[in-house]
Regions:
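Non-membrane alpha-helical structural segments and their capping/turn regions in soluble enzymes
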Residues: 34-41, 85, 89, 187, ...
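Conserved, mostly hydrophobic/aromatic
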Residues: 21, 47, 57, 75, ...
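Alpha-amylase-like alpha-glycosidases and glucanotransferases acting on alpha-linked glucans and related
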Residues: 8-18, 22, 112-223
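Loop/turn elements at helix/coil->beta-strand transitions in domains of secreted/extracellular proteins
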Residues: 15-16, 50-55, 96-103, 209-212
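Aromatic-lined carbohydrate-binding/catalytic grooves of carbohydrate-active enzymes
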Residues: 28-29, 46-90, 108-112, 216-224
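Catalytic domains of carbohydrate-active enzymes, especially glycoside hydrolases
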Residues: 39-64, 199-211
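Conserved structural scaffold segments of CAZyme catalytic domains across common CAZy folds
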Residues: 1-45, 49-50, 162-164, 171-174
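Hydrophobic or amphipathic alpha-helical targeting/insertion segments
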Residues: 91-126
Length: 224
């Protein structure tokens, strides 16, 4: 296994005082009964007056919300209940004008079962997403101690999940592969998953996000 890369911490982080916000229970700006991102922007001065200079924004991406947004359907789209991508970019800009920073909750270990990646991974025909998730090689075989779901996909295999049925585990490989379906942690399939997640981070960093709080930040490989 490769050692973790070393990068300097951003200077602002040393003095950061975070205010954590779960969007739906904060400020409702449009009267629909659900907190939203424009509501957060309206309260930036209030948050700064409390002595906070950074915001940790809990999951705000498109999701069926079967697990409070920790089941992401589209990493590059803000959940419609919270607003739009432009609303989130406006929050970044407004925070920066106040010398504040915003980090996003990133869930890299699994997606929603409604994510397009998973829909493609379920197909019988091999494609670029067949190994984006962890699948066994037979629908009657379990996950060697890992939780799994079988019999719900056209392909022959069961998929490994992290928590709930709605959260299929993304494939970052196995530290010590022992089965034919267990991909190596440094193999091309695991690298493709890593590259996809890096692409998500670059997408939001390029639009003004200051960083990420990584959910389940321990190494994503199985079998460690």
């Amino acid at each position: 296994m490769l050692p973790p890369a070393k990068h300097p911490h951003p200077k602002w982080l040393a003095d950061a005082i975070f205010y954590e916000i779960y969007p739906q229970s904060f400020v409702d700006s449009n009267g629909d009964g659900i907190g939203d991102i424009p509501g957060i922007t309206l309260k930036l001065d209030y948050i700064k007056d409390l002595g906070c200079n950074a915001i940790w924004l809990n999951p705000c991406f498109d999701s069926p919300f079967k697990d409070a947004g920790y089941d992401v359907r589209d990493y590059k789209k803000v959940a419609s209940r919270y607003g739009t991508n432009d609303d989130l970019i406006a929050l970044f800009d407004a925070a920066h004008r106040r010398d504040m920073h915003v980090i996003l909750d990133l869930v890299p270990g699994h997606t929603s079962e409604e994510h397009e990646w998973f829909h493609r991974s379920c197909k019988v025909e091999r494609n670029n997403y067949s190994d984006r998730y962890i699948w066994t090689d037979s629908w009657i075989s379990g996950g060697d101690g890992l939780p799994f779901i079988g019999g719900e996909s056209p392909r022959n295999g069961t998929y490994i999940l992290n928590f709930f049925k709605c959260q299929p585990a993304l494939n970052y490989g196995f530290a010590h592969p022992e089965r034919s379906w267990q991909k190596p942690a440094l193999g091309p399939d695991a690298k493709a998953t890593c590259d996809a997640m890096v692409d998500v981070m670059r997408f939001w960093l390029s639009r003004g996000a200051d960083g990420f709080r990584v959910d389940m930040a321990q190494p994503r490989q199985k079998g460690r």
